[in-house]
Each structure stands twice: as C-alpha cells, then as structure tokens.
Amino acid sequence: MTSKDPEPRSGFNGTLINLDIQKVQKIFKTMKNTILVFILTLLSTACANMDRRVHPASATSTRGLADTVGFAHLDWQMDSVMHRINRTFPSELLTAGVQPETAWRVAICPHDDYTYTSWHYPSLLKNLKAKTIIVFGVAHKARQFNIADRIVFDTFTHWQGPYKKIKVSAFREEIMAALPNNLFLVSDSLQRIEHSVEGMLPFVQYFNRDVEIISILVPFMSADRMTQIAAPLASSIHRMMARNRLGWGKDVSLLITTDAVHYGDLEWGGKNMAPFGADSSGYAMAVVKEHNIIDSCLVGGLTVDRIRKFVTTTVRPDDYREYQWTWCGRYSVPLGLMVALNLQQETQGKPLNGKLIGYSTSIDHHPLKVDDLRMGKTAIANLRHWVGYASLGYE
C-alpha cells in the first residue's frame, strides 16, 4: 500500500460511497455554519471583554525590555551610570536647588538615551518619594495598533528592573474597575514595545528598591477627550487613595514622561522637522521657542488654560493626531496634568506649581560615556538631528 493508492479499511464494502451525496453536503454545510457561528461568538466575547482583561491572582508575568542599548538594564550598569553622572555633572545636579525632603506629587521626565539625557533623571527622580508611581507614558506605536482616544493599561504583574523585578501595584485593578469601559483598554502588545516608561524605571528603582508602578499609555486624543478621561480617572485614583489611606506625594505620585522637541532634517523618517532651519541659527530659535512653551505652560501655577495652551502649541488644530510642535508627549503631558489638577481639587490639596529642574538638548553638552558599559546611542545627535529635554517637579 502506498499513500497515493491506499487500500480500503477492513469491512469497507462500498455501501458508504453510494450514500446520497446531496444529503452529505447538506450535513457538512450545517456543521460549517455552526462552527462559524461559534467562532464569531468567541471573537465577539473576547472583544467585548478586552477592556477588563486581567491576569488571575495566581498568574505572574514580567514585562521585558524594549531597549537594552540606550537604557541600563543591569545593576552594575546603573551603579556605573550614577557614579559617572555625579562625577561629570555636579553643577547641573545642584542648579535646581531642590531640598532633599521635597516629595513631588507630580513630575515630568524625559526618556531618551542615558548618554544624552543623563543628569535629568537623578536630579528629578531622587525627589519622587512615593512607593506607588502612576506613570503616564507616550504611546509611540499607537498608530500601528490603530489605538486612539482611550488610555492603555497592561496586565503584567511585574516589569523588569536592574536590581530586581518591579512590582505592578494591585491598585491598578482598583483604578480600572472604577472607570467606564469606553475610556480605556488593555494592550500588553503596545505596552511591551513602548520605551518611554521603561527608560525612567531604573532610576526610580535606584532611589527606591521597593517602588511599585502602574503604567498608563496615552495615545492620540483631542483636548476634549482628555477632559472626558481626566475627571473620572482622577476620581478613581482619589477613591483608591482614600480607601487605602494613602497620601499624595508621600504614598502615591504621578510621573509623566515626554522628550521635548525632535528637531532637524536628517534621519527623522524622511521628514523635515526643522521649521527654523537645520543650522546654528535654527537651533537657537528652536531653543527659544522651547523655553517659551515651558515657561508659559508648565512652570508656575497649573491651570486648565495653561494645559490647553500646551495642547494648542504642540497639536495641530485641524488634526489632533499630528504634531504642531514635535514633543512626543503632546498627549501624555496634558492628560497627566489634567488628572493632577482634578486630583488636587478632589483632595483639596495646595495648588500645584511647576518647578523647572532643567532644560538641555542632545547637542549642548558632551554625552555621558556609556559605550564601555554595553550601552550606546539609538540615534545621532547634531544640528540636523537633535532632541530637547525638560524636567519639572510639582510639590
């Protein structure tokens, strides 16, 4: 017997072959339709439950690393990076004049390669004292997933850290449970490839080995949509804090991330992002504009009008998915600050005032040496391709 010409099985007398072909076809058609309906029902149920998808209490999963070049991911790397920052940038670390006992309720931090951003991380994050940090991250790849208009959580129980795994706070489920379904979704896929949250965590853990986090990515959304999300999200956070008797700044803080302007006409995916020109004159004008944005929107008393001014400055009025001025955190910053403003009102806390810790660019100082630490650069830095960095704290 061969596979091409098999013998009939024992007892196979040919009677079955002579069955009514139409009847057999009808049976198979019915079975096919039943299976199709079953599959569609499963898919529909899965989509309907997507927003509430969480791991069972007994399951554990660790969010891995998206960038092992620009960021440290091992304990000895972090120790070396901190030693070099302290040795290389002592004046930058002291310029802000923040007292050691200061505890930020809200902080805005860059997330670029350590070789470029260096001193911004410790000068800001050393005053993040809370055990639970709610992070508002950029969703750089949201367009690939067609995600917009809803904040994005994950289901991971831990994130990879240089000293040990970073626990995801159980408060995440409390916050999600209190939110309307149409305001958020869960996407481990988007969270897994997003680098903005990941970049800050080694420094956060350096200063607090027992820190716990909640990662919230903020994709494309209009200012009006931010307002719709911010109020219930702040209420959910406030109720969680009240139930667990937690203090804002002492036990829970908000950490917002953004890099400032992405400028130049080289290696930006074929785009020209140099409205003032890609030379020294254009650089100077761009930096002036940067400080105008920071001073008029972020430094000093936080108000709704100043937050909305940030949106109109960085987001195109005719298409909220597009840049007006290229801060990658054009959604994470205003939404995070709207949540903070609502939370300040709910907690009846003192007004939030932004303090500029520092501003720099990837080309206004010598990069921190990291190439001997199994680290490096993920992008070039020159007049035709540079990035701005602003770090701010709100006490």
Spans of model-derived segments:
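Long, Lys/Arg- and hydrophobic-enriched amphipathic alpha-helices
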Residues: 342-344, 348-395
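Active-site histidine-anchored catalytic micro-motif
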Residues: 50-334, 338, 342, 346-347, ...
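Sec-dependent N-terminal signal peptides
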Residues: 34-43
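Positively charged n-region of N-terminal signal peptides that target proteins for export
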Residues: 26-34
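Residue-identity detector for glycine
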Residues: 11-14
